[in-house]
A protein has these predicted regions:
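Short, well-formed alpha-helical segments that are part of the catalytic scaffolds
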Residues: 7-30
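Conserved donor nucleotide-binding strand/loop of the catalytic core
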Residues: 43-68, 72
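A conserved acidic beta->alpha catalytic loop
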Residues: 23, 35-45, 58, 82
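Short aromatic/hydrophobic "clamp" motif used to bind/position activated sugar donors
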Residues: 78
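Residue-level recognition of tetratricopeptide repeat
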Residues: 199, 240, 276, 317-320
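Catalytic-site signature of metal-activated, phosphate-bearing donor transferases
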Residues: 64-70, 81, 88-208
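Single-residue signature of alpha-solenoid repeat helices
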Residues: 175, 210-213, 251, 287
Length: 321
């Protein structure tokens, strides 16, 4: 049977940490908890479960903290968990079975990440496979009978174990600070991180967060050539910002840019923004038309709810207006 190190990074998780560790304590062989600056009872709670509790100075970088946690692991595999995750009894048993039968050539195990009913998520599905269990020391294997080469792709196993993400508070302000600090340090956001930033802004960004994002987008546009996909995402956020800031001409400019980029067929998000614009200006028939376009004629690119749930609720609210 393989051995498993649990690695976690935490900060002010006193409300959920025991809930998480109680699920995992009978599965793992080692618990490593890295605290990034808790001011509540997180550290005393963690010390009830393990002596391996480490302090790590927060650097606005989750990867650095996770890498530090991984560096403390000693077991065959590393399981990475967040404090607001739980595993029910059926999936605990599945995890134990996996541990007893895991083949040594498996390097990553993916598990089903369940986000149903969460406080905040940018997933466009309630469940998705995510890598959760990692082989600590990787061996390299030669492949192909001639012109042989070393296999660089990991051997991945997709399990049916379900991990339930059940936060009790919204972390988006923390996330916005991290996105902003990353850009301030590097003047760069990778395409994947940029998209995640735009998704979080669309779901949860208030006027102040959108204004800061608009400044980042403006600065990035001077240094980086946006792909059409990234420019479309940015234009949605700029449109929302200008609508909330009551800057009609700039709002329309951003909205029209979407039509140009998407060759006349806009995305659901900009249809919802146009609907909200007309609704706020008292033109309810025009607003309804754009909600219908969002629901029936277009596809979302940032938030799947903008293509169904949001316009459906709005149309019910407007009724026969």
């Amino acid at each position: 049977m393989v051995s498993i190190s649990l690695c976690m990074i935490v900060k002010n998780e006193e409300a959920v940490l025991s809930r998480c560790l109680n699920c995992l304590s009978d599965i793992v062989d080692e618990i490593i908890i890295v605290d990034t600056g808790s001011t509540d009872q997180t550290i005393p709670i963690a010390k009830r479960y393990t002596k391996q509790v480490y302090n790590f100075t927060w650097q606005d970088d989750f990867s650095k903290a996770r890498n530090f946690a991984f560096s403390k692991a000693h077991c065959d595999y590393i399981y990475s968990a967040d404090a607001d995750e739980i595993i029910d009894s059926a999936n605990i048993e599945k995890f134990k079975t996996l541990k007893s039968m895991l083949l040594p050539e498996i390097e990553i195990v993916q598990m089903i990440y369940d986000e149903k009913g969460t406080v905040s998520t940018v997933l466009n599905a309630t469940q998705e496979l995510r890598p959760k269990l990692y082989k600590r020391v990787r061996s390299f294997t030669w492949i192909d009978p001639i012109h042989e080469t070393v296999r660089t792709d990991p051997v991945v196993y997709d399990s049916d174990i379900v991990i339930f993400h059940r936060p009790i508070e919204n972390h988006t302000n923390r996330d916005f600070r991290t996105f902003e600090a990353t850009y301030e340090k590097t003047h760069y956001l990778s395409p994947r991180i940029f998209t995640m930033y735009m998704k979080e802004l669309y779901r949860w960004g208030d006027l102040k967060a959108l204004e800061r994002a608009a400044n980042i987008i403006k600065d990035m546009s001077k240094k980086t050539e946006f792909s059409e996909a990234r420019l479309s995402e940015a234009s949605i956020i700029l449109a929302r910002y200008h609508r909330l800031a009551k800057n009609g001409p700039e709002f329309m400019k951003a909205a029209l840019r979407i039509f140009t980029l998407m060759q006349g067929t806009p995305c659901s998000e900009i249809c919802c923004e146009l609907a909200l614009y007309y609704e706020q200006h008292g033109d309810l028939p025009e607003a309804k038309l754009w909600y219908i376009n969002a629901k029936d004629e277009t596809e979302p690119i940032l938030d799947i709810k903008s293509g169904k749930e949001i316009p459906e609720k709005a149309l019910l609210r407007l009724g026969d207006a």
